Regions:
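Sigma70-family region 2
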Residues: 26-27, 50-54, 63-80, 99-103
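Acidic, proline/glycine-rich intrinsically disordered inter-domain spacer in sigma factors
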Residues: 8-11, 99, 104, 111-135
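Structural recognition of an alpha-helix C-terminal capping motif at a helix-to-coil junction
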Residues: 59-66, 79-91
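Amphipathic, Lys/Arg- and hydrophobic-enriched alpha-helical face
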Residues: 37-55, 71, 134, 185-186
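Short, charged helix-capping/linker segments at alpha-helix termini
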Residues: 3, 26-35, 45-63, 166, ...
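Arg/Lys-rich amphipathic alpha helix in sigma70-family domain 2
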Residues: 70-77, 87-108, 122-123
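Helix-turn-helix DNA-binding module
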Residues: 135, 139-143, 151-168
């Protein structure tokens, strides 16, 4: 799977064959669902990569499509299939984030922080690309950055999705941008 550039199709612009393939897939046609998968996997993977990081992105992408297959009968065509799939992906990724957060509390956050600091010290001369920098953000800041700056959600929508205040969303976005600037500036200054 190519993790360098996710597909750029907009969630509100339907792919012409989607309507036919959705109807066929809803009646059990696995080849039609495979076509839907191929048409949308890049965008879902890109979202998973940015929201969850490189490690779990591929597995989470598969989880999204398994869930889509299971819930396909609930798709009514009121929105484009891409929009429905995107919403399903965001919901699954947010649920996974909550689950991982609970696990981290049990295991201890200190190990994660130490690992990140060690990784920064070991490779300071390497210019970091944006995807890597986004992956290094703390979970909350990364989620909000991806939802707002990458996916185009408004702070009000993010607040509703995550169950947080609009002000918290804005503060986390500011934090994410400052952290990204800190991650990227050393590479920009030293590398060019």
């Amino acid at each position: 799977m190519d993790d360098t550039a996710p597909a750029v199709d907009s969630p509100s612009r339907p792919v012409p064959a989607d309507a036919v393939d959705v109807a066929l897939a809803q009646s059990g046609d696995q080849q039609a669902f495979e076509r839907l998968y191929r048409a949308h996997v890049g965008r879902v993977y890109g979202l998973a990569l940015r929201m969850a990081g490189a490690g779990p992105a591929e597995e989470l992408t598969q989880d999204v499509f398994v869930r889509a297959w299971e819930k396909l009968s609930s798709f009514r065509g009121e929105a484009a299939f891409a929009t429905w799939l995107h919403r399903l992906a965001v919901n699954l990724l947010l649920s996974e984030r909550s689950r991982r957060g609970r696990e981290r509390l049990r295991l201890g956050e200190d190990e994660t922080v130490m690992d990140r600091q060690r990784a920064r010290r070991e490779t300071p001369e390497v210019a970091m690309d944006l995807d890597t920098a986004i992956g290094r953000l703390p979970d909350g800041a990364r989620q909000i950055f991806v939802l707002h700056d990458v996916e185009g959600y408004k702070h009000e929508e993010i607040g509703e999705m995550l169950g947080i205040a609009v002000g918290t969303s804005k503060a986390q976005l500011h934090r994410a941008r400052m952290l990204l600037r800190g991650h990227l500036e050393p590479g920009l200054k030293g590398g060019h």
